[in-house]
């Protein structure tokens, strides 16, 4: 354990645990994961290996921020969790696995089924990036901004969405409001200038 000190230690533990599981050493896989710093994916794996309801409940309230699963081996783990509890987190993480493998249709189907339940802005940004329907895409970008109005990337995503669809007044409204709350932020000021130019407000730009 003391030898695993890199910044991706969680992945090292998970990789080793999955290897043990693949050769039928479930107990050793569980032991490895019990020593891991852990994240949401690890939490679901621990619940899956032990078939423990209490561990599943803990996984269902874990933080999924900066968790990006990509392993095919995790697919049955998340599918099991979805069947057992139906929490949106397991569906979201499963969608990310599909997304990482360019299975966009499968990812979008999973995300659509979660509706408006998730209170996690990146969920809506991810779904918007896959959603072909303009109305639904706009709703997801707006939901992300509503959930985390301090994060500049979400305000920028909504602004760029409006600009792509030539809704320049809406784009300007979004980025102007955000720029008043985040002054002297170079990416925001740059996007504000672009929005002003798109609205032919050259003097203000």
PLM regions and their residue ranges:
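Alpha-helical adaptor scaffolds
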Residues: 65-67, 120-132, 156-164, 175-176
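A conserved position within tetratricopeptide repeats
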Residues: 3-4, 30-37, 60, 82, ...
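Structural signature of tandem alpha-helical TPR/SEL1-like repeats
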Residues: 1, 23-31, 53-58, 67-77, ...
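TPR alpha-solenoid repeat register
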Residues: 12, 42, 90-91, 123-124, ...
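Short coil turns that delineate tetratricopeptide repeat
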Residues: 7-8, 37-40, 85-86, 118-119, ...
